[in-house]
Amino acid sequence: MLRTHLAGELRKEMAGETVTLTGWVARRRDHGGVIFIDLRDRSGVAQVVFRESEVAERAHDLRSEYCVKVTGVVEPRPEGSANANLASGEIEVNVSDLEVLNKSAALPFQIDDPSSSGEVGEETRLKYRYLDLRRERQHEALRLRSAANRAAREVLDSHDFTEIETPTLTRSTPEGARDFLVPARLKPGSWYALPQSPQLFKQLLMVAGMERYYQIARCYRDEDFRADRQPEFTQLDVEMSFVDQDDVIALAEEIVSALWKLIGYEIKTPIPRMTYADAMKYYGSDKPDLRFDIKIVECTEFFKDTTFRVFQNEYVGAVVMEGGASQPRRQFDAWQEWAKQRGAKGLAYITIAEDGTLGGPVAKNITDAEREGIAEHVGAKPGDAIFFAAGDVKSSRALLGAARGEIAKKLDLIKDGDWAFTWVVDAPLFEPAADATASGDVALGHSKWTAVHHAFTSPKPEYLDSFDENPGEALAYAYDIVCNGNEIGGGSIRIHDQDVQKRVFDVMGIGEEEAQEKFGFLLDAFQFGAPPHGGIAFGWDRIVSLLGGFDSIRDVIAFPKSGGGVDPLTDAPGTIPAEQRKETGVDFKPEKAAKAAQGEKAGKES
């Protein structure tokens, strides 16, 4: 090794020892001919000082991010000059020898200056990601990710799971998003697909008798670009044979508990569960944030005889903002704009004065009986504001769900270090295909119904006989785990019976021929004693970003894509030259090849 110690591990007890350090020049200061340098390596920073004239003279030429090797003696810092912000802050290294291992060009941005981190655009940070990663916060992210990998593996290994890699070049099998396709050079006109998940292969592993499988898997989805999505992402993928929902949930809770212990938080288990129906009814989301106690109150029945046309609708609901009546008029106007940005016409409201008098435009348009009873119905008191949404059930609840989150922010109800976990169970097995496409997903199949999770999710046992007769009523044997309003994992008990799988395909408008073409290898496997099985997949990027308190999943990925799906570092995706296009067969036209083959055959016959 070129060094004897790490910079961040030096302590005052080591005073008098001669050490050799390697790393980068984080800061350089010249105090009357004595040169001080903050030397950074993966462990942290140590102050090194150049007092001897010859070596100090050479140190004058050092600049930020020069890669250097120094040898010197560990000494206590002079009284009053200790730095409590550094683990090595009580010592310095008096350097006797300096070697410049490599110089650095002028930096595109300052690395160790905290004030510059917010000034550097993300595109620039990602273009020079190798410099951005030198920052301590980014080091923390990748070390935390490694620790999370290790913690999960320890739990799974203790339960006799086997880590197995599944293919990343496979055939295109629709799973709810578009595939990334890879041309097969040796078979022109044919394409591999990068997997959206290991779903089908892990089910085949259960048929193979592996019983307990896991993998930290790379997945790929060609989705429309969203602010906090990545075209390639990582999930912890788990599958088990001979289990029911409670078994998978118990294991998942053990994994999640181990992960949050990394940051010193003890999760109380069992984690509470709520049904999908209750999540939507009370929180307007299947990913409810339970760090604050604001619930949606249904008012449809309360306003069933109303003369107010806005409330003469399929659904009316409300949320209460404690103390919200004191907001100025411009703030209520801002609420209207906020709602319009979400596709609503506005956000109706009532204010309750300290004397109980109702104010706001809604109060003028409802009946005396409605005015007298509304506060009690929604649980509001003097000084509060009541916000309403009316219209179709889905969009109205979604608006109120967003409003409860906005209220929590305005009232500062969410504190640092708050964690709230829940399982959401009993989701619908199917949804209207139009709803799936409207939300940006790919609706698998050709009927008016498509799978909410995926086509291999089993109906709950009580719906096994009837799900194809009443698809809209059937519930899935599925479970999602939610943390602070983020879905961090989801899974289900799978279909293991070929006949049940065929019936699910029938509901989705996938005929026998198409099913065999796209999923035949799985359906064939089900003929050979497939065991009952189920599993779960955790969104690894999301979990690590939550654990570390990062704003974006891009912060916990070593080399992420930008929000537009572009890699500023390598400038991917890029074009390819004509020669490479020809070689890979990207432009292969089957009909043209067939015509040429026919002509060649005719020529030989003549």
UniProtKB/Swiss-Prot annotation:
The record marks H31, G80 as: Important for tRNA non-discrimination. GO terms for cellular component: cytoplasm. InterPro entries: Aa-tRNA-synt_II (IPR004364), aa-tRNA-synth_II (IPR006195), aa-tRNA-synth_II/BPL/LPL (IPR045864), Asp-tRNA-ligase_1 (IPR004524), Asp-tRNA-ligase_1_N (IPR047089), Asp/Asn-tRNA-synth_IIb (IPR002312), AspRS_core (IPR047090), GAD-like_sf (IPR004115). Its main location: cytoplasm. Its EC number is 6.1.1.23. One of its GO terms (molecular function) is nucleic acid binding. It catalyses: tRNA(Asx) + L-aspartate + ATP = L-aspartyl-tRNA(Asx) + AMP + diphosphate. It is an enzyme of class 6 (ligase). Gene3D superfamilies: Bira Bifunctional Protein, Domain 2, GAD-like domain, Nucleic acid-binding proteins. Belongs to the class-II aminoacyl-tRNA synthetase family. Type 1 subfamily. This is Aspartate--tRNA(Asp/Asn) ligase. It comes from Corynebacterium aurimucosum (strain ATCC 700975 / DSM 44827 / CIP 107346 / CN-1) (Corynebacterium nigricans). The lineage of its organism: Bacteria, Bacillati, Actinomycetota, Actinomycetes, Mycobacteriales.
